[in-house]
Amino acid sequence: MSDKKGEEITLRVAEAFYRDVGRGVARIDPAVMEKYGLQSGDIIEIIGKSTVPAIVWPSYPEDRGTGIIRIDGSIRSNAGVGIDDKVRIRKVTAKPAEKVTLAPTEPVRLMGGEAYLLRLLEGRPVIKGQKIRVEVFGHTLTFVITATRPSGVVVVTRNTAIELKEKPAEEVKRAVPDVTYEDIGGLKRELRLVREMIELPLKHPELFQRLGIEPPKGVLLYGPPGTGKTLIAKAVANEVDAHFIPISGPEIMSKYYGESEQRLREIFEEAKENAPSIIFIDEIDSIAPKREEVTGEVERRVVAQLLALMDGLEARGDVIVIAATNRPDAIDPALRRPGRFDREIEIGVPDKEGRKEILEIHTRKMPLAEDVDLEELAELTNGFVGADLEALCKEAAMHALRRVLPEIDIEAEEIPAEVIENLKVTREDFMEALKNIEPSAMREVLVEVPNVKWEDIGGLEHAKQELMEAVEWPLKYPEVFRAANIKPPRGILLFGPPGTGKTLLAKAVANESNANFISVKGPELLSKWVGESEKHVREMFRKARQVAPCVIFFDEIDSLAPRRGGIGDSHVTERVVSQLLTELDGLEELKDVVVIAATNRPDMIDPALLRPGRLERHIYIPPPDKKARVEIFKIHLRGKPLADDVNIEELAEKTEGYSGADIEAVCREAGMLAIRELIKPGMTREEAKEAAKKLKITKKHFEEALKKVRPSLTKEDVEKYEKLIEDFHRMYA
């Protein structure tokens, strides 16, 4: 083997840090390194069922004294060990490699593969028989080192000759996917639960015999699409070295009598013969729906067969069933009991920390520019699941590629090395990608972060401040609220005359707090079918919880939740009000979800909705006073070609009783009058372009516009609103 070997040390295997994956690095407890005189950069052999070399690096201070060695899935697989197994290590002296020969595990032809593999392996120690995982265009290829010169542990250098054979290496291909625990981010707790349910029974059945209990037989993973349910099943199968049999619902189904059940029996038989095995049933709701709800005979028989196989008279041996679904309530309840699916584990939408971990995984092989801040990206991707974040990273990389495409000669045999070297993914690429990728949970309820800022709203300082405190602060500074042990308000009612800016305020608050925004119009929730309207309300709150932090905005809430028990009241609205009440203040907590409702008829809303714990903050949005009108004019005249005789103060004086929407209409009408004067009949486009340079909106245009656009609020209207507010405050003060 190598010339010189050190003494053997026994350590416990732990998973690698994300940034070390694929680098051939072993991070060791610093105390062990000091004790045995190991230096950073030394080369060691890791001895499990087989032997693999790695470069030593010290682990982080928190690992001191734990006696662990952190190695990635590739090294674990080469050494034939799993997490928490014991391995022996010893220091070796490696020679520089003159030549390394690799063969793929499946037929593949890589253009320029030798140069690519040399770049990847440079500086890494390798040994004959070692498998190397390589990412090419999003696919993982595995190569086996079939020979090295000299033999033993060698280090690949810039001068090493790499030979790539076209014929695949002769080795048994296991039915196990190439996914390791390091490929899963943001699911530490869930992964731990799944591992203790599955790894322990398969690796150490004697523990369960000693306790005199049956090991768990099945685990049901449920959660929204794209959160990583299938990925967890693949990683567990790979890490425990079990035979992996994936089943997708439709493959089982057959129209011929008895054939579907036969297929299921064959799968369980194959699993038993190749034990330890994991059977993975994806989308289990499609093959085991509730029997009372299906009309087809096949589904009922399949459910019955699955029940018998999972908890039948025959012992199943080392076979564990993992099932995944995003509709756990659609599964037959007989499956959801101990002895069949013993544990149900929710695989939820990742929080900010989880999103950062997932982004680290998907960008670990990406050449990122200095200005890319993954912390910031994690902040901006509320409601994104793992699959969305993967799509975001791919889109950003494609954007970077489009940027350099003009410099690349597509016809050339090889792209110049300097072009490849300078290819970097920047913050700008990620920002562009964010515009195109939205959370998948939200594609059906259009969620947008509106592009309205506080400065786009004239006046209303008091309302802005109240909204900031109630919505923006709890979402931006949750730690302060936790320290004070105060729960922020759940709901806010904006009320006031039409056109005063209630909807605009809701949009601005969603944008400024970086929250997702779901806008609900009353009529689209109402349905003539019994139970449908409530279901829509329930679904919407469920989605909002999923993509939290989120602002749900109900416009014209008086049409959706009128007073119950009134004359001519339909039962639909009564049921919708009840559903809204339970969602806002029910047993299930609304975390990071704020409800904002707007109305110009607060007296029509059901009083139960307006008590503390529901829509508890009532903010009156008054018609603008003179100061606010000046600000609104400034906002709407931004960038317009005004003549010198236009005086905004004077315009504000003349628009007493005008709402924000009326003032916008005045500015638009004045602009249209100026355009009408400019464009003459039969004018060509070129002439119009020339004339446009002289376009000015004058005082005369505004005077004309004011004659056309009348205020939508009369003095009586304003007085009526003010009286209404007094009554309203008296009721809810």
From Swiss-Prot:
Stored CDD domains: RecA-like_CDC48_r1-like, RecA-like_VCP_r2
One MF annotation (Gene Ontology) recorded for this entry: ATP binding
Binding, ATP: 223-230, 496-503
PANTHER family the record matches: AAA-FAMILY ATPASE, NUCLEAR VALOSIN-CONTAINING PROTEIN-LIKE
Source domain of life: Archaea
Family: Belongs to the AAA ATPase family. CDC48 subfamily.
Lineage: Archaea, Methanobacteriati, Methanobacteriota, Archaeoglobi, Archaeoglobales
UniProt keyword list: ATP-binding, Nucleotide-binding, Repeat
Gene Ontology CC terms: cytoplasm; intracellular membrane-bounded organelle
SUPFAM superfamilies: ADC-like, Cdc48 domain 2-like, P-loop containing nucleoside triphosphate hydrolases
InterPro entries the record matches: AAA+_ATPase, AAA_ATPase_CDC48, AAA_ATPase_domain, AAA_lid_3, Asp_de-COase-like_dom_sf, ATPase_AAA_core, ATPase_AAA_CS, Cdc48_dom2
SMART domains: AAA, CDC48_2, CDC48_N
Gene3D superfamilies linked: 1.10.8.60, 2.40.40.20, 3.10.330.10, P-loop containing nucleotide triphosphate hydrolases
Name of the protein in question: Cell division cycle protein 48 homolog AF_1297
Coiled coil segments of this chain: none
Pfam families named among the record's database cross-references: AAA, AAA_lid_3, CDC48_2, CDC48_N, Vps4_C
